[in-house]
């Protein structure tokens, strides 16, 4: 199987659709046995973005749970629409459905943001079901602040132009290239382009709006579990200041800085995520 095929395929495992009260159906895949590791992807992405991370994790004695965020991949959007509280509620539902105890929640980009909202909204769930969290290329709101890339791309998303840009191989690949650091394989760019083109439609604009408008930094002190904060030093989407604040204001947090790496840590440094998860589960 080629690298591109390995990246784009849906992982094999037990497929579950969790029904939410508003009609949302959350597409989940689980595999393995042992302490639970939950992988939460970012905006316009899908659970497939974790294929390289999964390749490493499956060598460990862990149970991995991946899911498509509502409105992404095979997960639908229910009557309550797209909002940070609704999506934090989805996290809660997944933790409860899989009866997670002493789990490690790994959130990338928006997935990390929603982990913060989960901890703020449902602190008892985090304290009883999670052993630790890992916030990768993450933030806690006001995501346009200090990011020229976001200030340029958000108007394109709001205008409904992003899918058209991403469907153009030249324009799309040029844009996706900015999500990575110094060195990147062409397969990573192409697979990311295809996935984001399918999910960045105009009816998903609420996903952008709540990350721009909401500020959950004042709530970071409420996070009571050990937290690893991972950031690429060339991240243009969630610049360094976000991870600096996460690391400084979450009581039991530790920063990891990745030289030459951009926003797409799940592709650029999956071995780092795997290594840190191993330390957390053990």
Q: Where are these predicted regions, by residue range?
A:
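Alpha/beta-hydrolase fold catalytic core
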Residues: 1-37, 59-62, 100-101, 281-282
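Catalytic active-site module of serine/aspartate enzymes centered on a nucleophile-bearing elbow/loop
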Residues: 253-282
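Conserved alpha/beta-hydrolase "acid-adjacent" motif
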Residues: 236-242
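Flexible "cap/lid" loop of the alpha/beta hydrolase fold
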Residues: 116, 120, 124-162
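Short beta-strand/loop motif that positions the catalytic acidic residue
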Residues: 223, 229-231, 235
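Active-site loop/oxyanion-hole signature of alpha/beta-hydrolase fold enzymes
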Residues: 21, 66-110, 126, 275
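Conserved HGGG/HGGXW glycine-rich cap/lid loop of the alpha/beta-hydrolase fold
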Residues: 24-74
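Conserved alpha/beta-hydrolase catalytic His-Asp/Glu region
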Residues: 144-147, 165-221
